[in-house]
Design a protein with these regions (language model features):
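Hydrophobic residues positioned within well-ordered beta-strands of beta-sheet architectures
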Residues: 5-7, 78, 92-94
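A generic structural signal for well-ordered alpha-helical segments
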Residues: 2, 115, 145-147
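Internal metal/ion-chelating core segments
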Residues: 1, 5-11
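N-terminal entry module detector
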Residues: 1, 108-111
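An extended, acidic, His-containing surface patch that forms the Zn2+-binding/catalytic region
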Residues: 13, 17-89, 97-106, 121-158
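Transmembrane helical segments that form the transport core of multi-pass membrane transport proteins
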Residues: 111-122
Length: 158
């Protein structure tokens, strides 16, 4: 009693478009915390429920029921990135790359329903609509990208 234990979880960072090449420290930490014999309390219960929705290694939303892909943009990717828990609340953030076939109905509302089943509330009102940029787009060539960024952010702000 009165002892404080500090736990540091270290992962391998990865872009949200390729979370499979990383090792998510947060979801790994949730696995570890879920195995500890904590007394039941709302915070511990919510952390365990969150861990059940975002299991370590599930980078495509399978557990949430939103795994999908299309030929143009590939697989949906999902990364659980932030979690803050205090005596009164819990707040988490996840990032995803949604294929162009994804929308509010087949992604956002499915996630909202799965979270509600666990007593969690998704606050997002709408998805940022998926988009695709062709690989041969003028914008993607590095010299053109740099030229465009310079025009947008330097030339227009001087």
């Amino acid at each position: 009693e009165g002892t404080v234990t500090e736990i540091t979880a270290t992962g391998i960072g990865a872009h949200a478009s390729t979370p499979d090449v990383g090792n998510n420290a947060l979801t790994g930490l949730l696995v570890f915390l879920g195995k500890l014999d904590f007394a039941s309390c709302p915070q511990v219960d919510m952390v365990r429920k969150t861990a059940s929705l975002f299991p370590h290694g599930d980078v495509n939303g399978k557990t949430l029921g939103v795994a999908m892909e299309d030929e143009l943009s590939g697989n949906l990717t999902l990364s659980f990135n932030m979690l803050t828990v205090d005596a009164a609340s819990m707040d988490g953030e996840f990032d995803g790359r949604i294929p162009v076939c994804g929308n509010d109905e087949n992604v956002l509302e499915v996630v909202r329903a799965r979270m509600a089943e666990q007593g969690l509330t998704l606050l997002n009102k709408a998805l940022i609509p998926p988009h695709h940029v062709s690989a041969d787009s003028y914008f993607l060539f590095s010299d053109r990208y740099e030229e465009t960024i310079k025009t947008l952010y330097v030339d227009n702000n001087t």
